[in-house]
Curated annotation (Swiss-Prot):
Keywords, comma-separated and alphabetical: DNA-binding, Metal-binding, Nucleus, Repeat, Transcription, Transcription regulation, Zinc, Zinc-finger
Protein name as annotated: Zinc finger protein 490
Domain (KRAB) ranges: 57-132
GO cellular component annotations of the record: nucleus
Organism: Homo sapiens
Role description: May be involved in transcriptional regulation.
CDD domains reported in the protein's UniProt record: KRAB_A-box
UniProt zinc finger (C2H2-type) residues: 156-178, 194-216, 222-244, 250-272, 278-300, 306-328, 334-356, 362-384, 390-412, 418-440, 446-468, 474-496, 502-524
Localisation per UniProt entry: Nucleus
InterPro entries reported in the protein's UniProt record: C2H2-ZF_domain (IPR050752), KRAB (IPR001909), KRAB_dom_sf (IPR036051), Znf_C2H2_sf (IPR036236), Znf_C2H2_type (IPR013087)
Domain of life: Eukaryota
Assigned protein family: Belongs to the krueppel C2H2-type zinc-finger protein family.
């Protein structure tokens, strides 16, 4: 990739000085770069060869690039002058047949799609007027989008709200939000002559239909060098790369949280408004988006339309199916940079990363206990109210989360998909399998920040941490006694219910606690001669 000279320029002087210098330079282009190109054009008319001269002048020689921060410091008048200068420069270069190609991109993605029109060209050549040489500005050579991307320049701004865009096509799409124009209505081009033979969908450009056809052919020309995953579309490929680089360019103005994808930011922003238009009629749970709502409804209906081709297991949503399929391939593409542990899914990696950061932004309103995810906090809050909306159709047992119900259902099916390669032992649940693996590795990944004690299980760490904080969230409704964990509360309740699940095989005597049974069994062993 070509190194951007503006980056080194930025390091040397304050931003205001850089802008002033570049601004003076861009104004000077009307008398330097532009005239040089015109002189070359005139020499061609006189029969002189211009090959050596065009070789000596490139786009970088005659164009001035501003970074996004520098562009923001220019007033509207300066921006308009800059556009006029650059438009003239592009016209002149087009007249002499100058061509621009990003060789790095061509080498990296050969035969992986055509070059796209430069965002700067889109912005500067909105009017299709003719060049002095007789060529139309619409004949300016196509430029690769990466030519402008490194500079951060976004010269297309919305005249209604002032929002700035990299591509003219992005600005056109944005303008529909003001005009309420439907996405499939193309007022700019009118007819859509290119029709897909598979599904009948029509397009304005042949390039658009070629890209669309990949959905039917299954072609995935863009491959990630990090994990080998392939994509049909360039934008999907670029979004995926951010998983490996950790780049989060989209930031919420309300809370400062950053996201990899614009769609994720838009989804997050609705959390601040509190709007949840999709409500489940069965349990009353509300959702911001339709897709999670649809997936949730299937926990009540039992519908599982997505089936694994390997083992026939069915799932309620495609995400669960994709995660499951990796258990067959053994693929774990998501690696923690802190400890090197690998995961099947990106969501699992995100949950794991929080064990290193210690961030627990979600707090129970009832007892004050903090959680790493909103779903965990929501499930926990149900323990206070005794709410268990998810019921097993086999045995009638109820659970406070759909995931617990799904795990429980394996008890009836007897499915044990997770097998230890060390000893061959099989497990119903991936969590039990991972915990078992630590018996071989002796790994204790969970450390108490207060005293440094380490634990094999996260639940043990949480229980231990309460010994420092004194928090006892689990309270007995019978006598009011509080406990640090739910298991201790369950054991305590036997005092009130009289339940004695532990029975002696020798004499049949029953006990409320396993410890009491062990003590009792010793009385039999001592009686033996």
């Amino acid at each position: 990739m070509r190194r951007n000279s503006s980056l080194s320029f930025q390091m040397e002087r304050p931003l205001e000085e850089q802008v002033q210098s570049k601004w003076s330079s861009s104004q000077g282009r009307t008398g330097t770069g532009g005239s040089d190109v015109l002189q070359m054009q005139n020499s061609e008319h006189h029969g002189q060869s211009i090959k050596t001269q065009t070789d000596s002048i490139s786009l970088e020689d005659v164009a001035v690039n501003f970074t996004l921060e520098e562009w923001a410091l220019l007033d509207p008048g300066q921006r308009n002058i800059y556009r006029d200068v650059m438009r003239a420069t592009f016209k002149n270069l087009a007249c002499i047949g100058e061509k621009w190609k990003d060789q790095d991109i061509e080498d990296e993605h050969k035969n992986q799609g055509r070059n796209l029109r430069s965002p700067m060209v889109e912005a500067l050549c909105e009017n299709k007027e003719d060049c002095p040489c007789g060529k139309s500005t619409s004949q300016i050579p196509d430029l690769n989008t990466n030519l402008e991307t490194p500079t951060g320049l976004k010269p297309c701004d919305c005249s209604v709200c002032g929002e700035v865009f990299m591509h003219q096509v992005s600005l056109n799409r944005h303008m529909r939000s003001h005009t309420e124009q439907k996405p499939n209505e193309c007022h700019e081009y009118g007819e859509k002559p290119h029709k897909c033979k598979e599904c009948g969908k029509t397009f304005t450009r042949s390039s658009s239909i070629r890209t669309h056809e990949r959905i039917h052919t299954g072609e995935k020309p863009y491959e990630c060098k990090e994990c080998g995953k392939a994509f049909a579309f360039l934008f999907s490929f670029r979004n995926h790369i951010r998983i490996h680089t950790g780049e989060t360019p989209y930031e919420c103005k309300e809370c400062g949280k950053a996201f990899r994808y614009l769609t994720a930011l838009r989804r997050h922003e609705k959390n601040h408004t509190g709007e949840k238009p999709y409500k489940c009629k069965q349990c009353g749970k509300a959702f911001i988006y339709y897709q999670p709502f649809l997936t949730h409804e299937r926990t009540h209906t039992g519908e599982k339309p997505y089936e694994c081709k390997q083992c026939g297991k069915a799932f309620s949503c495609p995400t669960y199916l994709r995660s499951h399929e990796k258990t067959h391939t053994g693929e774990k593409p998501f690696v923690c940079r802190e400890c090197g542990r690998a995961f099947f899914s990106h969501s699992s990696l995100r949950k794991h990363v929080k064990t290193h950061t210690g961030v627990q932004p979600y707090t129970c309103k009832k007892c004050g206990e903090a959680f790493k995810s909103s779903s965990s906090c929501e499930v926990h809050e149900r323990t206070h109210f005794g709410e268990k909306p998810y019921e097993c159709k086999q045995c009638g047992k109820a659970f406070n989360s759909s995931s617990y119900l799904q795990l429980h259902e394996r008890v009836h099916t007897g499915e044990k998909t997770y097998e230890c390669k060390e000893c061959g032992k099989a497990f119903l649940y991936s969590t039990h399998f991972r915990i078992h693996e630590r018996t071989h590795t002796r790994e204790k990944p969970y450390e108490c920040k207060q005293c440094g004690r380490v634990f094999i299980y996260f639940s043990h760490l949480r229980r231990h941490e309460r010994s420092h904080t004194g928090v006892k969230p689990c309270e007995c409704k019978q006598c009011g006694k509080a406990f640090t964990c739910l298991n201790s509360l369950k054991v305590h309740k036997r005092i009130h219910t009289g339940e004695r699940p532990f029975q002696c095989r020798q004499c049949g005597k029953a006990f409320s606690y396993s410890k009491s049974l062990h003590v009792h069994e010793r009385t039999h062993s001592r009686q033996k001669p």
